[in-house]
Structure formats: C-alpha cells, structure tokens
Amino acid sequence: MTQAATRPTAETGNDEDILAVARRQVLEGGQGLSRDQVLQVLRLPDDRLDDLLALAHEVRMRWCGPEVEVEGIISLKTGGCPEDCHFCSQSGLFASPVRSARLDIPSLVEAAKQTAKSGATEFCIVAAVRGPDERLLAQVAAGIEAIRNEVEINIACSLGMLTAEQVEQLAEMGVHRYNHNLETARSFFPNVVTTHTWEERWDTLSMVRDAGMEVCCGGILGMGETLEQRAEFAAELAELGPDEVPLNFLNPRPGTPFGDLEVMPATEALKSVAAFRLALPRTMLRFAGGREITLGDLGAKKGILGGINAVIVGNYLTTLGRPAESDLELLDDLQMPLKGLNASL
C-alpha cells in the first residue's frame, strides 16, 4: 500500500520544476512524491502557493473524488494519562488545567446521535491512556453496543497502544477504524515523547491492519520539526499506507512543555497540507485539531481546495473546533458532497 518511496528518484533533480514533476508523477501516474520530492515542495516560495494548492486539489479530485468524509470525536476518558506527550494537556505529568473525567454510556450515545445528525459517517471514541485496561475495554464494548442499538454510524476508536489480544477484541466488537497517530517523524519523536517509542506505535498500527480494521494515522505539524523531518514523516506515512491521515497543527496548551511554542504560519501549514496530498494521492486526508487557530476560515477553505477530503466537525478533545454548521455550509458552498455511510463501509 506504499504510495511514495523514501529513496531519491531520477526526478528529484533541480533541473525540472517540482510541480511539473508532481503533475506528471502524481496527477497523471498516481505515484506519490518521495521524501526528497516532498522536501522540494515544502521549500517552495510563498508565491508558488496558489499553484501548489491547485495541483493538490486536482490530485485529490482525480484519485479520491469530490466526496468529503465527516467525523465526530468524543472523549470517553479525559486527562490523567501517564504518558508525557509534550503537546498534550491530558498528560497527568504536566501542570495543565485538564482534570481526569469519564463519560457515561447515555452521554456517549447522545454524542453519537448528534454526530450522525450532522451528516457524519464516523464516530470516534477516544481515551487518554497509554493503552486500555479491562475496565476501559468493557466500557467501550458496552458503549458500542448501546450506540449500535440507536444510531446508524461507523464506530472508530483511539485507545492508545494495544496488545494483540486487545486488537482482536476491538475487531470482534466491530470497530471500523482505529486511530493511533505516529505524531511526527521517527527522528524527531524523542523530542516529543519519552515514555514510549515511535516503534511501539508502529507495532500497534501493524496489528490493527492485520486484524482487518481500517488504519487511521497522522500527526501534529509545527512542534519544532525541521522541513526535512516533515518530509521524512510524509514518507513514513506513505510506507505505512494508512486509510486515513489526520493532520493536526500544534495549538500550544498552557502547562505543557510545548505551551510556549509559536503557532505555525498559515502559508507553511497550507504548503504542508498540499505536500502530504502529493505524497499520499489516494489517502483520506483529514483536517483535524489546530486548524482554527492556524488557518482561520479562509485558510480552511484553501485547505479543502488544496488536498483535504475529510474533516472533524465540532469540538476536539480539549479544545474548541468550528461549529459543525460552519463546516457543512462551507462544503455546500464548494459543492462538495458528503460521503455517505454505505460508501464508507
């Protein structure tokens, strides 16, 4: 399922414009850009941004089509996580204002109902944990059963790192898609997390795929990684070949080690969106957390016209998102149909 090669190709030389190469290689040939080629895209001057976004949109339309998948997420267990992901206000190791809390099953079902009413076809149950214990898995199982009895929607989960037995349990529950983000390039990961390894995350994703669930894996841009590491990350995702890549942009949270980092410039964020589309021409590329503070309304529109073909509507885990109505109105204005439930199965 690899869409891009990490090795240099004959087309990465400086004698030909990278967008001309991408038009031939990606748009016409369906082969994602390599790591070195993605780096060339990320280094394009700002006056090439409109051309880059237009090409990324063409690639998305050709290889993914016009439909946009809409997803809602809910936090089943918030805060108190033992891991030290430096961007995350849910870590119990930092002095952030987020406190540990659990959601009950009726509230979970109501959230799923509201998500389905928005036109979403995917509802993701998230927990702030290193990995699920028996109590949490039992709660997830009960929640999935209760949702299925009342709501027609695909159910995804994001519960941290899994054992082989837990992967099988989730598959048997009928989980449609499992999210576990690599977060950043392998070479930069130790700057972001020290309580577990990038390889441990990769192992979970491999087991999820082997069990027949869809793989959702992306990360957060703007955590201090270099452009070279951002290109490395795109190539690593292409090697993994996930069904979906959520792109988050760092929204610095008070009390976390990354709380004082600056927000990524909008032009840099849009170049990154387009570059990831050119590396992953057939993959669902989802706007996720941080887009509001990074891009605003105009930037969100440019992103959807620059390679994005999926969105999270409503709020995120610990930060506010755009109202679902705003995103749905934008998609309607752009004449982009929502992906139906049957098409997402």
Swiss-Prot record:
Belongs to the radical SAM superfamily. Biotin synthase family. It comes from Mycobacterium avium (strain 104). Its EC number is 2.8.1.6. It catalyses: (4R,5S)-dethiobiotin + (sulfur carrier)-SH + 2 reduced [2Fe-2S]-[ferredoxin] + 2 S-adenosyl-L-methionine = (sulfur carrier)-H + biotin + 2 5'-deoxyadenosine + 2 L-methionine + 2 oxidized [2Fe-2S]-[ferredoxin]. It comes from the Bacteria. This is Biotin synthase. The gene is bioB. Its cofactor is [4Fe-4S] cluster; [2Fe-2S] cluster. [4Fe-4S] cluster binds at residues 81, 85, 88. Homodimer. GO terms for biological process: biotin biosynthetic process. Keywords: 2Fe-2S, 4Fe-4S, Biotin biosynthesis, Iron, Iron-sulfur, Metal-binding, S-adenosyl-L-methionine, Transferase. SUPFAM superfamilies: Radical SAM enzymes. Residues 66-291 form the Radical SAM core domain. One of its GO terms (molecular function) is 2 iron, 2 sulfur cluster binding. Pathway: Cofactor biosynthesis; biotin biosynthesis; biotin from 7,8-diaminononanoate: step 2/2. [2Fe-2S] cluster binds at residues 124, 157, 216, 286. Catalyzes the conversion of dethiobiotin (DTB) to biotin by the insertion of a sulfur atom into dethiobiotin via a radical-based mechanism. SMART domains: BATS (SM00876), Elp3 (SM00729). Binds 1 [4Fe-4S] cluster. The cluster is coordinated with 3 cysteines and an exchangeable S-adenosyl-L-methionine. PANTHER family: BIOTIN SYNTHASE, BIOTIN SYNTHASE, MITOCHONDRIAL. InterPro entries: Aldolase_TIM, BATS_dom, Biotin_synth/BioAB, Biotin_synthase, Elp3/MiaA/NifB-like_rSAM, rSAM.
